[in-house]
Amino acid sequence: MPPSGLRLLPLLLPLLWLLVLTPSRPAAGLSTCKTIDMELVKRKRIETIRGQILSKLRLASPPSQGEVPPGPLPEAVLALYNSTRDRVAGESAEPEPEPEADYYAKEVTRVLMVETHNEIYDKFKQSTHSIYMFFNTSELREAVPEPVLLSRAELRLLRLKLKVEQHVELYQKYSNNSWRYLSNRLLAPSNSPEWLSFDVTGVVRQWLSRGGEIEGFRLSAHCSCDSKDNTLQVDINGFTTGRRGDLATIHGMNRPFLLLMATPLERAQHLQSSRHRRALDTNYCFSSTEKNCCVRQLYIDFRKDLGWKWIHEPKGYHANFCLGPCPYIWSLDTQYSKVLALYNQHNPGASAAPCCVPQALEPLPIVYYVGRKPKVEQLSNMIVRSCKCS
């Protein structure tokens, strides 16, 4: 080595040691998604919501409030809004099934309706208008130990002969012994028995998540405004409508039942652990200091943030947004430079790494006026519930 090189060696040694001791930067910390200022993201999210609300209501501009009557909202309108809000809250509380669970074969179980000598039936007035069907949730949990394992639930009823056309409605027992409408069916006259099936997957997931012991449904004749006869004409196996309002004794194994399709119990632990690893939802993100992709809190006050006074309920809501880097799954020594170069050539404005985007969104019920008429509307996909890298 020339003398000049020897003189430089003491200066080069610290640099060489620094290169040796410093680990190569893993690709897991890299993302080609541009880093955006948090306040800028919030402002953009607010402006996006402004446009979304007007677009979903098909309004070119906020409606005039000149004709809005003074005072509080009418009680009927407020009751409709509250019931809509409660229904949305109940549905959003339901656990989401995991895509991985759809791969596995489903175990099918039948849970029969509770027999009518159970005291639960004494709490409901016997009527020619309706029949009641209650189920023991302990039997449901024995068949499906975790709500996330439930793939599908059907309420099956064996309809007997029907002489006249009958419009029926199915309701779910709700809080304070109230009833929530689920669906309806128009039954044609028939001389032969026929199985009726109602999809009640969401309802059964709610039951599995709650601590109640007995839950139930009500099948009722449709109440027509121009008809005085609201008698339930259809006979369901296991009941006799009685025409006198009497609930007859249940008979046979073909009484109403729930057909449950669920992923087997032995896979529950695997799916549950996978769910915790993947769930970038509000429960996880709001209680952690996660720096990567996650749901970020954002409350929008309609008056303060949007300058709007025309939305009367709610006054604001938690819109939230997704933010955070989505790491590469490759390491630096396994990246295919030619593939990435070709990708960037054909997609110069795109990211070579996934970006943080919404996965689950919830609706937002609102009350607003059009002229002097109050309206209750449900705006879809307004609340970010969870995020994913995509």
Swiss-Prot record:
One of its GO terms (molecular function) is type I transforming growth factor beta receptor binding. This is Transforming growth factor beta-1 proprotein. Gene3D superfamilies: 2.60.120.970, Cystine-knot cytokines. Residues 75-271 are annotated as: Arm domain. PROSITE patterns: TGF_BETA_1, TGF_BETA_2. Disulfide bonds join 285-294, 293-356, 322-387, 326-389. Residues 30-74 are annotated as: Straightjacket domain. A motif (Cell attachment site) lies at residues 244-246. Transforming growth factor beta-1 proprotein: The precursor proprotein is cleaved in the Golgi apparatus by FURIN to form Transforming growth factor beta-1 (TGF-beta-1) and Latency-associated peptide (LAP) chains, which remain non-covalently linked, rendering TGF-beta-1 inactive. GO terms for cellular component: blood microparticle; cell surface; cytoplasm; extracellular region; extracellular space; nucleus. The keyword tRNA-binding does not apply. Residues 1-29 form the signal peptide. Belongs to the TGF-beta family. Pfam families: TGF_beta, TGFb_propeptide.
